[in-house]
Each structure stands twice: as structure tokens, then as C-alpha cells.
Amino acid sequence: MNRPLSKLARFISSPKGAKIVLIAWILAIGVLSFIAPSAKKYATSSGEGSIHEDTPSAVAQKILDEQFPSKDGAVALLVFHGKNAITEADRAKISEISKWLSSDDKPKNVASALPFHQLPKATQDKMFSKDNTTILLNVALTKGLESDQIYETLDQIRNHVKQMDIGDLKLEITGPAGIAADTITLFKNADFVLMFATIGLILIILIIIYRSPLLAVIPLIIAGIVYEVVDRILGLAGQNGWFVVEKQALSIMMILLFAVLTDYCLFILARYREELKKRSSKYEAMQVALTQVMEPILFSGGTVLVAMLTLFFAVFNAYHNFAPVFSVAMVFILLGGITLIPALFALVGRKAFWPFIPKVAEKEEKLSGFWTNVGTLVKKKPSITAGILLIMLILASINVGSMKYSFNLMKSFPNDTSSRQGFEILEENFPPGQLAPVTVILKSDKEIALDQPFVEKLASLSNSIKKLDGVNTVTPEITSGLSTPNSNLPKNFLSEEKHAIRLQLTLQDNPYDKAALNTISTLRDNSKDLLTKSGFDSEQYSLHYGGQTAQQLDVQSLNQKDTIVTFSLISIFIFIMLAFQSRSIIIALTMMITMLLSYAATLGLGWMIFHYILGYDSISYRLPVYTFVFLIALGVDYNIMLVSRIKEEAQKYEWKEAVARGVALTGGVISSAGIILAATFGVLITQPLQELFLFGLTMTMGILIDTFLVRGMLLPSILIFFKPNRSKQISSIPTDLK
């Protein structure tokens, strides 16, 4: 280890230094608690609609806001549904609700509502489903509402409807506002459940591993201290607008922090226990232990930090907004790992291990146990071990090619949530395209003259769009009457500035299906041709498409680009760091390839379970990216710990023996750390969103595969074939590999 790190280890492990470190962390909590709020206060949810402002759908929305300004914000879709046809009495109740939503007594945050009660009966009849069991009322809320305000407003609507006693009719609220309200409901107590489940699980596992109350509690105290500091720093960031504090990122960050810090505790404690058996001074023992593990911890934590920083290169906000939260967290996790953990355990000393207090032993303990046997197997039969594992992992990886992805947020909600039930009722009772119509904007650089020639061109354009595959209807109907002076134009048809025409089209397919996305893609690709063939000058006029389907097409495009960028950059940066740490390109390349294979096998095996056992038709498109970032970044930790120990043992033993001893000496602590990490991510299985459930399950499988099969057996069996000429010198490994 280099001189500055040795000096730092010596200071932290000294009686005075350990006390200074502990006091500094406690003071940091005190000061931050006084001046900074909790991160939860300023946390926001970017959601699936969080796309870059330069995307076509965002440009369309900007034009829409400029040309057709509105006070309306998020839309709530009130779905009234009965098992039998809606009666006249039911219709009267719905009319009363509509009248209330248009009156002065309506909730203050309701901006406007569809005036069902004012419509002629013939028009009302057209609003019902074919079997007359379902009707939909649109309610627009005030712009700029927070999620809590949306929840309260919809709650007022539900309570009013409940008081009116609508009999056998069932009310479900879906749409953007309904989704926002349900998100609040789903995660109302989720953070507390997540935290206590994580703490409880780690506590139980640590008690089983160490059978020592202090060794079970101290790591949690350390994680709690660091978490409090990180929470307040992120709160400051949110308060001052330094960056977006993403809600979902906070939940996963908490798990990451507790799991990684507990892992660092295990790594340091394993070496500390070894040294306590060699020397009487608890401070000297910690100094030697910390000197041995500080560099691996810095490199392993550094690789995780680099992976998180790489997310800044992502354009899609759902990924980009994870970067600052996790980067800040990793900085303090690293600081806690190399300062707070050794300082606190140095002060507690041997008492931390009670009732199994390590004593100074005259002889070195003989290696034994499960991982010693694994090390022996790897040393004696490396080819067979590596071959069997490679075949297993490659076979599991093949399933990756058959994975199907969903861009429908509703599919991630539990079946019993109101927004999902409302959406599915609409799916069953109305044409699919009506669920989320597409807004078509004809933008002109000059003022539009609504004369006969223009109307004829517009009619031609409307008909051309209607003839395209995948398009069901285009409204309003373009007739010659629109050019008549003082004619009653459809609402929001021509903008006030007369620079835009607004049309609405419905698709033949579900707006979230791949076929619908392909239709929008075709429309975009053929926009100029459509304009030209209809007689419009494509230099003056342009077509823009807005709405959920157009937005999801952009999400798909951004996701594909960001997947390539993040996968490439993370792989390159981590490979460079591994090469620098191991001082060997071959070893670094081997570690990188095995981690990538582990990731592919995890996804493939996960898809088998999700699709063939759990019955999912598709999974969230974000799952592969999230899994890659965390699985690769966290998997590096164990590889670095293993290779560092092998290199250390290679100073005293022949290379094959050094590999076997490295497996034996690190197997117990790394497998324990892996179990804790897998278990903490497994807590996400309790979360209500399907995306978090599948992410937690995937990470749990991936960590266990990486810990026991890849790191525990595959990597060592491959390393056996690397034969340094000067195996007794660490510095010889990178240059002398043959």
C-alpha cells in the first residue's frame, strides 16, 4: 500500500485518531440535523414521462403549450362501471356528479370537467361502451399540483361519490392523476417497511454469522450514522435545487448503503480478527488489518462510484436522476468504510467479538471448512470446474434473446389499484386507441388563413393520415364549412395566434403496444411526404405528434441509446480500474468477462422464472439497465477482495496454492457479505411496484450467482492457469504472466 494510505490507516487506528474520527461523524450529524432537512421532503418522482426536452414528443408538447395555453394540469379519468347495463337512475347520478364537478362546490384543485350533465341525450349515449356498462368522465386538475395535492383532490371526489350512493356502479380513477394518487398510496409506508425490514434482516444474518450481539449491532449503528449524513446532504441538495432527488433512487440508495457498509464491516472484521490473534494491542491489530484492506475497499468502492457517475451520461431522466443520489451516497459510504468502521472497532477492540473473544495464538490456525474444500477443488480440477460453470452460465444466458419489454407503467402497478383497474376496464370496453389519443399539430411559420384552399389541403392531409396502417380515426372531420367566415370552429382547433392546427387521432392498437409505437414512428418518418402530397410547403409547415404513445416511442429510443452508452462506459471504466488495481490486463479482462457472463446468466435465468413460472408476458424496459449498473458495480467488490488476497498469498506460496488459499481465506467473509447484500436487495420483493419486485428478485439471484459460482469457483479456476514466474512478489504478477 502506498505511503499516504499507510499514514491514514495509522492515524485512524490510533487511540487519538479513532476518537477524532468518531467525534467528527457525530458532529456532522448534529450540524446537518440542525441546518438541513431530510431528503424525503424534497424527493420527486420523475416517472416514465421524464424525457429529454429535445425529443420529438417534448417539442410537440412545447408547441402545444405555446399555441394552445391551458390552465388544465394532470387529467383524472373517472371510470363508472357496472356488471349490468347502466340504468337511467345511474345516469342521473352520474349527471349529478358531473354537475358538482362543474360547480363552485367542486374541489378547489379541479380546473375543469367534461360537462356530461349539459350534453344532449344522443351525445351522452355515444359516450357509453357498446354494452352500456361503462362510461368515462374526464376531469382536469389545476396545473403544477404536487402528488399529495392530487391525492387529496381525488380523495375528495371519491368521498363525494361515496356519499351519493351510486348503487352497484363502481368508480375507478385512472389517467395521469390517478396514477400519481395511487403512487402516493402504494408508497405511503413503504420507506419505513423497507428500512425496518432491511435493518431486521441484516441484524438476523449478522447474529447467525457471528453469534455476537455487538458484532450484529455495531455495523447497523455505523450504517445509521452514515445514512443520516447522506440523507441530510441530499436534503440540502433538494432544498437548494442542486439536483433532482429521485424518490425511487432514495429507496434503493438506503438498501445499497446498509448492505455495502455491512460488507465493508465484514471485510475489515475478518482481517481484524486475524490480527488480534497475532498481537495484543487492539490498535496495532486494526492498523495492520486496515493497511491490508484499505486499498481494496477504495478500489471496490471507487468502481461503484464510477458506475454511478456514468449515469450522468444518460439522457433519459429516469437514469440520469439516479446519478447524483447514488454518487453522493457512495462518497460517504467510502468515507465511512475507511474511517468510521475501523475507528469504532478499534475503540471497542476485542469486546466486539464477545462471547468469542479472539486471543493471541502461538500457532497459525490450519485452514479448514467448506471454502477450503472449494479452494482445493479449484486447485486440483480447474479445467473441469471452469468448464461445467461456463456451460451452465452460457446456457442460462441464451434466454436473454427471448426477453420482452413493457413500456406500460400500469403493468407495474398491483392488480387491485384503482388506476390499473380503471385502465383495464377501459381496455375491455372501448377501442384500444381511445385510451390515449395522439395529438397531431400542424405548425406554420406564418399566420394560417383558414380559406377554402387551405381547408382542402387540410382535408387531404387528414385523409392521408387516416389511410395509414394502424390509424383508426382522425378528428375533427375536415369539411368545407370550416372556411366559412365566422363559422363555429371546433374547440382548440385553431390556435389564438393562428400558427397551429390541432387534430386528434386514435390508433387501432393499444397505445402502449409495440404496434402503436411503430405507427407513430411511421407517421414521423413520413411527415414531409404527407405534407407535400397534401399540397403544403414542407419549408413552412411541420407536423408534430404528442401524447402518451409518442412519448413512449421517445422513451424507447432514449432507453436504447442510454443502454449502449451506460453499458459501454461502465465496462470500460471498471476494466481500467481493475487493470490499475490488479496491475494486470489479463486478470482485469478475466474479471470483467466473468462479471458480464454472470450478468447475462442472471437476466436469462430471471426471464425463465418471470415468464415460465410467474407468468409475466414482459418486464420493465428499465430492469436490464438497473441490474447491470448495480450487479456489475457491486460484483467488482468481491472480485477485488479475492484477487487482492491471492496476490498477498502469492508472496509466500506457489501460485496455485496462493489461489486455493485466497479462496479459503476470503470465501467465508465474501459469501457472508454476498448473502447480506442479496438479502437486502431481496427486501425489494416486498415493494408494491412490479418493477421493484422484479429488480429485487433479479439482484438477489445475480448476487448469489456471482458470490458462490462466479467469484467463488469460476474466477479462481481460471486464475489457476495464470503462472507468474515470480509468484512470491506481488509486483511481478502484471509483467510476468505467461
Which stretches of residues belong to each language-model region?
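Membrane-embedded transmembrane helical bundles of large multi-pass transporters/channels
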Residues: M1-T44, T142-M403, F536-Q540, Q548-K738
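Residue-level detector of family-conserved "landmark" positions at structurally sensitive sites
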Residues: L22, A74-V75, P355, I388, ...
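N-terminal cofactor/phosphate-binding cores enriched in small/glycine residues
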Residues: L27-A28, S38-A39, S46, S50-T55, ...
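Short, contiguous strand/loop micro-motifs
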Residues: G47-E48, A85, A318-N321, A361-E362, ...
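Structured non-transmembrane domains adjacent to transmembrane bundles in polytopic membrane proteins
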Residues: D54-D72, K83-A177, S402-S618, I640
